[in-house]
């Protein structure tokens, strides 16, 4: 097993919210070439002064993406307690559908709007590095979902977050190439209003 300072995973000095600046994969490659299974401590790095830093929320996922990029991995698999990425929160919407593939842009938007499957920093780093991420359950054996450059076609992703103070308020994220158009924005709002949904903000 290796800690961040042994690799090293170099970061800036923003303790508690450090940004990864560089990963030297040479030590890991040597261990892999020797036939060893390498376990790396996530969520941490080392700054230019040699001080240990922590990456903050989503730091473990971000560490995994950074390591995958440094190793030129074909794919990164993140095991979690969910079966993948769904069209909406299955705890709120029982009919939520698992997405086979979702684009980096869509996943980044979902993460920024409250979906808690992946942190937005890890998604942004994966997109910049071209690392596909497979998200799957460690319990069910589901195929999970792949976050990659080109997702499957779906315009309305669905409910991503429900506020804790009211059960009647939800955030809905609509994605798609046509959505910046005012005409399409009006069409989405009109469809919601016809369904009896009051639009609070856009």
Where are these regions (language model features)?
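Short linear Ser/Thr-Pro motifs
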Residues: 60-63, 137, 198
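Short hydrophobic alpha-helical runs that function as membrane-insertion/retention elements
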Residues: 75-79, 133-135, 200-201
